[in-house]
Amino acid sequence: MAKKITGYIKLQVPAGKANPSPPIGPALGQRGLNIMEFCKAFNARTQGLEPGLPIPVVITAFADKSFTFIMKTPPATILIKKAAKITKGSPKPHTDKVGSITRAQVEEIAKTKMADLTAADMEAAVRTIAGSARSMGITVEGL
């Protein structure tokens, strides 16, 4: 018989830097989950990723105080800002442009994000990422 699910916890945790301090500790503690067990497992799984890159994670809490977690790909905005070498998007995205990225960079981001996107094919994923970039005030060259 399957375990009874008591809830889901959604967090964004920096890769390789999970520790019991907020927001992780309180979120897991109020459900009675083992905080250190999660931190060790998460840090082990994110070992190969760039340290500090925020990773969305969905933790499924069970009635017997056990848990499982699913890691998603980093947010598209983080990857776009990194590719454009900027710290934040434009406050007026359609009038003030803050940077530019090439189609090749957009395709690389789309490849990374493909698992989490609802796009049917690679071209649709590229258009989705390009739209996100444009809404941040970043021009997409070659598209």
Curated annotation (Swiss-Prot):
Forms part of the ribosomal stalk which helps the ribosome interact with GTP-bound translation factors. InterPro entries: Ribosomal_uL11 (IPR000911), Ribosomal_uL11_bac-typ (IPR006519), Ribosomal_uL11_C (IPR020783), Ribosomal_uL11_C_sf (IPR036769), Ribosomal_uL11_CS (IPR020785), Ribosomal_uL11_N (IPR020784), Ribosomal_uL11_N_sf (IPR036796). SUPFAM superfamilies: Ribosomal L11/L12e N-terminal domain, Ribosomal protein L11, C-terminal domain. It comes from the Bacteria. GO terms for biological process: translation. The gene is rplK. PANTHER family: 60S RIBOSOMAL PROTEIN L12, LARGE RIBOSOMAL SUBUNIT PROTEIN UL11M. One or more lysine residues are methylated. HAMAP family: Ribosomal_uL11. One of its GO terms (cellular component) is cytosolic large ribosomal subunit. Keywords: Methylation, Ribonucleoprotein, Ribosomal protein, RNA-binding, rRNA-binding. The lineage of its organism: Bacteria, Pseudomonadati, Pseudomonadota, Betaproteobacteria, Rhodocyclales. It comes from Aromatoleum aromaticum (strain DSM 19018 / LMG 30748 / EbN1) (Azoarcus sp. (strain EbN1)). Gene3D superfamilies: Ribosomal protein L11, C-terminal domain, Ribosomal protein L11/L12, N-terminal domain. Part of the ribosomal stalk of the 50S ribosomal subunit. Interacts with L10 and the large rRNA to form the base of the stalk. L10 forms an elongated spine to which L12 dimers bind in a sequential fashion forming a multimeric L10(L12)X complex. This is Large ribosomal subunit protein uL11. One of its GO terms (molecular function) is large ribosomal subunit rRNA binding. Belongs to the universal ribosomal protein uL11 family. Transmembrane segments: none annotated.
